[in-house]
Amino acid sequence: CLRAAELRLTDGIEAITGWGLAHLANISARLKDSELGFKALSRIMAKFLLPNLFTCHNEGELFQMDANLGFSAAILEMLVFSQSGYIELLPALPQGLSKGAAYGILCRGRITLTELQWDMDRKSVSVTVLSDTDQQIRLKLPCAIKSYEIDGERQEKEQLPGKGSCPESVAQLKDGSYSGASGCCDASQIRLKLKKGGETRLLFVLD
């Protein structure tokens, strides 16, 4: 995918259509090339956004919905990655979005992030998590956690096994525990128990 994205830029980002830029932004976010993704979204806003906020295929011509849908999808890719038992916050956050908030993000695993706020200049991230079922998950931050609170109570830090941000290195066992890369600890992750129908609010201070 990375090589394909590089080849796509052979003729320059200026040669890419509106929907192509949205596609590039999504691919870049998943590959954690946050600045390329942000560059693609910025070009959509500068050249492919009509006065009514619809997007177009060519610059200023021919309405096409693709970039509208792809734009919002790319923003979500920058803010959250999820799979069953694993949520990663701000996996591809560009410098241009160093502070912000998002609400009502539906994640895989029957989880909703009812509120997500971040201020990377202050190294602060807060999130409110709502689960549709009793479960235990891993929650990963963009860098090492200095301290954190759950529902206003300060928590003890723990070192969990797992290699970087690769979700493939995290496996949930039948007893509800997790296995990861042997001998490798990740200070950017916590284990979180969630109750069905209950909201859990977390506040993180990052290193």
Describe the role of every protein-language-model region.
Residues 1-87, 97-100, 123-125:
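Active-site core of glycosidic bond-cleaving carbohydrate-active enzymes
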Residues 23, 36, 155, 166-169, ...:
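Substrate-binding groove of N-acetylhexosamine-processing glycoside hydrolases
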Residues 87-95, 167-172:
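Short, basic/low-complexity N-terminal boundary segments at the transition from targeting/disordered tails
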Residues 89-134:
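Surface beta-strand/loop "capping" patches
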Residues 112-113, 155-157:
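Short, isolated positions in well-ordered beta-strands
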Residues 130-144:
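Surface-exposed beta-strand/loop patches in extracellular or lumenal glycoproteins
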Residues 139, 161-207:
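C-terminal beta-strand-rich structural cap/linker in extracellular carbohydrate-active enzymes
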